[in-house]
Amino acid sequence: MSGFHRHRRSKLIIANFSGFEADLLRSLAGQLVELLRNEAAVPRDDVDPFEAMMDFSGPTQEPEDPVLARLFPTAYPDDEEAASEFRRFTEGALRDGKAAAAVTIIDTLEEAGLPEQLTEDGLMIDVELDEPTAETWMRSFTDLRLALATRLGVEEGDEAYWHALPEDDPRAQAHDIYAWVGYLQETLVDALSR
């Protein structure tokens, strides 16, 4: 696990993942895409055809899923009507953008040689990202970390709790994944700044 760095000559952002790491990233990104698209795909009977054509027919209520509520917070907590209108006009495009960013991770890993089914031990995946693609990965890492933190109940200053969990506790393992994605994001930000 070396994280991201900028190649001196090509100026591309590069990382080297084991097959397991690449497959884990693909799985996390795939789960995020599924979450974003499944709730958004619920048909609504009250959609105005013009609004649908202009993509102004998004949801008006805060999502029930806590991860989605964290990814799409209420813009105006003190004004329910304004919050509803803001969500209606923006959430659909935001969901599409977040899903597209996660799909970029999946596509990049597969283009770099990650097979559909990981069967080979010792497989290494070399990823090379131009700046726009690296920025897309960075945005998706933010969404992945928010999703993991929400599911785990991670809060600021609670590191001692997570470190005290036994290694075989599934929550500790999930927190390790959360920390790993944070590490990847940190190295990606650093590589982009060079």
Question: How would you label these PLM feature ranges?
Answer:
Residues 1-128, 132-194:
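Charged, alpha-helix-forming regions
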